[in-house]
Amino acid sequence: MAKINDNYLKLKAGYLFPEIGRRVREFSAANPEAKVIRLGIGDVTRPLAPAIIKAFHDAVDDLATIDNFAGYGPEQGYDWLINAIIEKSYKPLGVSLKTEEMFISDGSKCDCANILDIFALDNVVAIGDPVYPVYNDTNVMIGRTGDADEKGYYKGIVYMPCTEANGFIPSLPTEKVDIIYLCFPNNPTGTVATKAELKKWVDYANANDAVIFFDAAYEAFITDPAIPHSIYEIEGAKKCAIEFRSFSKTAGFTGVRCGLVVVPEEVMGTTPTGEKYSFNKLWLRRTTTKFNGASYPVQKAAAAVYSDEGWKQNKEIIDYYMENARIIREGLAAAGLTVYGGVNAPYIWLKTPGGMSSWDFFDKLLTECNVVGTPGSGFGPSGEGFFRLSAFGHRENVIEAVERIKKNLK
């Protein structure tokens, strides 16, 4: 009989969001009259920008003609999309990238998992706590860890607590690590890192021959001009950092699927015999073997994000979500809750009232307010006692949800 990958059996429970979905379905089935407002999983609700829709239509029309038909494209992505991203999104930051250093994918979540293919299992990994569950669970799945302890920490991973005391910015590891996960603007806490804070991480990585996995999925939501949008704004980062970006929240592509990875040619690893080798070359080899490229219509739509019209239209959508964030943040603060985030990120990280556990507060909001959020403990032990709300809802639902919560907490 075929044997399973028993590393999956180490996973503590169902993935966070399916568990939330299960509880909501059970509640809705028992209470069909309840109007449940979902501010949990970070799915977008606004339609795609008109310029993006037009590009989609045009690309589909291309596929209907002999002259413009597109079959298999380059696995790394079309140059016209990569160059548009570099020109519009990186050069204004003072960041210079080669076309060969960017890879278009079908989503950042997959990239954050798949990048592990090119790193040896005996690398020591450091992740924040609380953290986007994909970072933790994918390392468990591939066999990098032992079993979890009673807190939920896995042997073999270095956890970096992100708490109120440190402003939800992790401290540098006290031990040597090889791979460091950083996410700014942060999911779930909504915090951001300054250039000075990121410089400490870049210096640590270069001094210890470590590689930073920098998740910049929410960089488009930054409103403070002093906050960096890319790790490559930091001197020395191109020697030690791999950056992930997503079109899911930036352009509403949650149902379209497109992302990108930047792997600078300068980022090096070592072979078992101690020779240096380029991670860029390894990622290219992995990509050409396991991926046939994002679809032509999707890449055409993604390119429209970087047109003048698409850029303007998309900014209006992002502003809409950030106004939602303001409404949630200020409304809950007025209700007496301690809130973080929601200024440079679409997530609000709130402290549960009265020392209530994260899941108890989830059940309270669901059953008493018919509002769905995300328990902080689902992101890691240090998230216990906190709760995440998303700004990606419809405006009228956001306003109603805040009013329900305020009324309930009086």
Curated annotation (Swiss-Prot):
Domain of life: Bacteria
Reactions catalysed according to its record: (2S,6S)-2,6-diaminopimelate + 2-oxoglutarate = (S)-2,3,4,5-tetrahydrodipicolinate + L-glutamate + H2O + H(+)
Modified residues (N6-(pyridoxal phosphate)lysine): 249
Chain residues that bind pyridoxal 5'-phosphate: 72, 108-109, 132, 187, 218, 246-248, 257, 292
Keyword annotations from UniProtKB, A to Z: Aminotransferase, Pyridoxal phosphate, Transferase
Gene3D superfamilies hit by this protein: Aspartate Aminotransferase, domain 1 (3.90.1150.10), Type I PLP-dependent aspartate aminotransferase-like (Major domain) (3.40.640.10)
Family membership: Belongs to the class-I pyridoxal-phosphate-dependent aminotransferase family. LL-diaminopimelate aminotransferase subfamily.
Xref: NCBIfam families: DAPAT_plant (TIGR03542)
Protein name per the record: LL-diaminopimelate aminotransferase
Organism: Geobacter metallireducens (strain ATCC 53774 / DSM 7210 / GS-15)
Name of encoding gene: dapL
